[in-house]
Every structure is written in C-alpha cells, then in structure tokens.
Amino acid sequence: MPKFDVAKHDLERLVGKEFTVDEWEDLFLYAKCELDDIWEHEGKIYFKADAKDTNRPDLWSAEGIARQVRWALGMLRGLPRYSIEESNVMVYVDENLKDIRPYGVYAIVEDLELDEEALKQIIQLQEKVALTLGRKRKEVAIGTFDFDKLSPPFYYKAVEPQKIKFIPLNCEREMSADEILEEHEKGKEYGHLIKGRPYYPLLVDSEGNVLSMPPVINSETHGKVTEETKSIFIDITGWNLETIMLALNVIVTALAERGGKIRTVRVIYKDFELKTPDLTPKEFEVDLNYIKRLAGVELTDKDIKDLLERMMYEVDFVDRRVKLRYPAFRNDIMHPRDVLEDVLIAYGYNNIEPEEPELAVQGKGDDFVDFENAIRDLMVGFGLQEVMTFNLTNREAQFDKMNIPEEDIVEIENPISQKWSALRRWLLPSLMEFLSQNTHEEYPQRIFEVGKATLIDESRETKTISESKLVVAIAHPKVTFTEAKEILDSVLRHLGAEYTIREIEYGSFIPGRAGEIIVEGKKVGIIGEIHPQVLENWGVEMPVAAFEIFLRPFYKGSFL
C-alpha cells in the first residue's frame, strides 16, 4: 500500500482548522489512511500516512486528505465544484507512437502560490500515482513544467534515438538518449520501457526545446518547477486513455485545492481530438433498501443523504433508488457495496457498536471441494501424476500455440508481464507447457490437473463464471486416442455417466482423431490426439493424447 509524508501545518492550512495529533489520528480514517509514524523536524510535526486503498489515488497527498476531512466534518457538502476555463494551447500527438506509448493528456493550472511543502506534495503525489496506479510508469508517467517558461503549441513526437540530445533533470551536461538510459539514475530504472524501440517518445515545444522523454526523465533546462512557479503545465502519457485521464484529474484537482485555476488543453490525434482534463461527474445508482439492509445500523433516508453528501456525492432519491453523482477523480465505485462503504466511513466505524454473533457455527469442508479431491484421488489411482499450474496465462498460449482462432477471454487491464495477462479459458495449454518444460524427463508422462477455468458469461453480475475442470494428458512414443479414451471411460463410469463421442474438426487435434464428449445431449468436454503443429509450437517431442471435461455437471451425480 502507498505510504507518503504530510506536514501537520500544511494539512491544517488546507483544511482551515487546527487539530491535535490524537484528533488527526482519527481524521485520517476518513481518508482511508492510518498514521504509520509521527516525528518532529525544526519545530514542525510530520505524519507518515499509510493508505489502505490502492484504488483511491486522490487520497495520496495532503491536498486529498484535507479535502476529504473538510467534507467528512461537514464543512463542505455534496459534489466538489472546480471551475475550468479553456485555453488556446494545443498538443499534437504523433501517430508513430501508437506501438510505443500512444496516448498523452494535458492540462494547465494557473495562479499557484507554492512553497517548499507544497512543492514536496506535488512531486510526491506524481511519484505515488506513477508508481502504483501507473505500474512503475508503465501505464502512467507524469511530467510537470513551469508553463510560463514554455512556448506552445507542444508536440508529443516519435523521434529516432540517435537524434535525441538534451540535459536531463538534475544533470549539468547534455546527454544522448542512449547515454541517459545507460548512465542516468532514472534511465537505468525506467529505460527498459522504451529501450530497443525504433523511436523514443519526446515532448517538445514550438521552438524545439525538449521538455521530457516520457516515461523516463524531464529536462533540466526547460520548464523545471520551483517555488517561484505560478503556472504548471501537466503532461501524462501511457497506454490507456481512461487510466491517464484519471491520473490527470487527480493531479489537477490536488493543485486546485491549493488555489490553482484549471485550464484545458486541446490534444490533437490523427483520427480524433480531446479536450483535457474532463471533470464531468460520474454517475451511479443504488437501491436505498440495500444500504439500509446491510449497513448494520439504523439509518433514515435523511441520514443516508447526509452521510453521502459528506463523502462528496450529489444525491437524489427516485422511487427508492439513490441516484448519485461523484467526482471525476474517483474510479472505485463499481458496486453498491462501494457506496455502502462510503456511508459507513462517514458514519464512523468507531461509532458502530460491535455485536457478538448469537449463532454457533461449526466449520466443515465445502462439498464441491470434497468432490474435486475425490476426483484427484481417483486419477492418482489410475496411475496419473497430478500437476498444479497457474490460472493466469496469455492469449498466445490459449489460442496461437493451440492452433485455434482467438475468442473473448478475461484479460488483465494492467498486467505486470504479458506472460500473465489473462485468465485461462481451458486447462490443456497449461499441461502442454508443463510437458514442454519436462522433455528431459523419462517417458511415458501421464499427468492430470483439476483446476479452474474462467469463461465470459454476460448474464452474471461479474460477467464471468469460474468452472472446475479435469484435464488429462499422456505423452510417449506410442500414445493413441484409445489410451486417453480408456481413462475417460473409467472416470465417467465411476461418475455414473453414460457418454458418446462425436467426431469434430478442432485445430488443436489431428483431423479424424478428435471428438466432443456428450452426456445427456450436452457437450461436457473434448478429447483427441494433439496436432503435430501444436507439439511443434510448444516444443514437445513426443505424441500426446488428451481430454478435458467440466466437473460441475457430474457433481451429486455419482458415488463420489
């Protein structure tokens, strides 16, 4: 979880009221933070805040905490209002960045009065947002510049590395792009995000002055922000527009809390145009009875409205529904329980009387888990070895290497590694990878796994369903379809199921040696001999026969 430093005197000038240290310890809870440490320096008190929610970057600074406290105490209510004026400033985005770092969003904040503490908070907030929300700058990189020292319009360009030279931040000499990546502290840390690309991203002004080389480093000589800076130009780049727009909203509203005036920037892409930032409030709706039923305390309609307004919501009641508008610097409201959480934060968890449950509860194993374990025991009894592989995978493993067309799968929005960028929709690719990593071991190799596959299901609240499956793979020089079918036959016989196999053509299997497994007219699995192309894709040197079946249809239907 993010940890960050704030000064007591800075918080209090932003709130407009003084508090004791003990009072601050309670007030931090409104901002989903805890006090991790307290110390004194040159007669001033400082706090180290430990954020308890990685989905609230708006709370990772003195400005965000002070804003939350003002609303929670009822000093202000409802939706925060930020005035935004248009500017004639434009940024042109190079289409050649589409495979390097395709998106940039921008803003200007004017009329600032900065001191040492305010400057520390700006820099710290940038770093925390880029580190956590930005996945160490992979998804979000932030630059801030003294706007009065720049010459708009600006150009977010794709430039050949050998043509790049400028003085990077905290340096005294001009360096080439390669020198920056190899010698500069930030180049060593973040250079891998662009190194080896035919072009590097570069932000320049109309006079060709380099402002930054995102996501690595800013320029030392053009636009460095100091305590004398009155207007800040903000540049945020990344791979996902929604994510970098959120980051921009967090930064500009934090600066607005210090009296800054926000101005928009026109961002010109080849095929579309944006005006950023966009602080249009977001909307959500929740059943009023849901809140009352689950809150655990007696709340009237008026109570709920009051509590939500103290958490920066604009509230309307329509036919027992609560229609809400909330700030654009939040993206964590995804379910009614998120609204309920805010109600209880405003109410105060410390004000809820603990109750000891009256029901005696005795724990027991989940019946379906017991069923899965019985399947495992059965497979071991057939002489197979159990393996346990990861639920996370990638499109290449699920489709390309298995020689089948791509389909919709559940993907991770911000994966740390492309190898682990999706949830698997079937288990056989995982066993093929296992076999590919054990070609040096003795054959035959007869393995199985009981594991989860995640499928798209639009009818469900989460739009997905997790299915338990059994997969078996057998590898040796003389393996055939028949050997896999014999194991399948034994499994289904023990489960009390009659089945048929309907021949199909499927890219993962040899034509004429693949089939769907049908039970009571429904497809429950697939069986076949692995296609030579698939074996080659995985680097598996032996023939393989395999099958995979859903387990849920057989639950409660067998002696197990």
From Swiss-Prot:
Cofactor: Mg(2+)
Pfam families: B3_4, B5, tRNA_synthFbeta
Binding site for Mg(2+): D332, D338, E341, D342
GO process annotations (BP): phenylalanyl-tRNA aminoacylation
Record's GO cellular component terms: phenylalanine-tRNA ligase complex
Enzyme class: ligase
Family: Belongs to the phenylalanyl-tRNA synthetase beta subunit family. Type 2 subfamily.
Protein name as annotated: Phenylalanine--tRNA ligase beta subunit
Record gene name: pheT
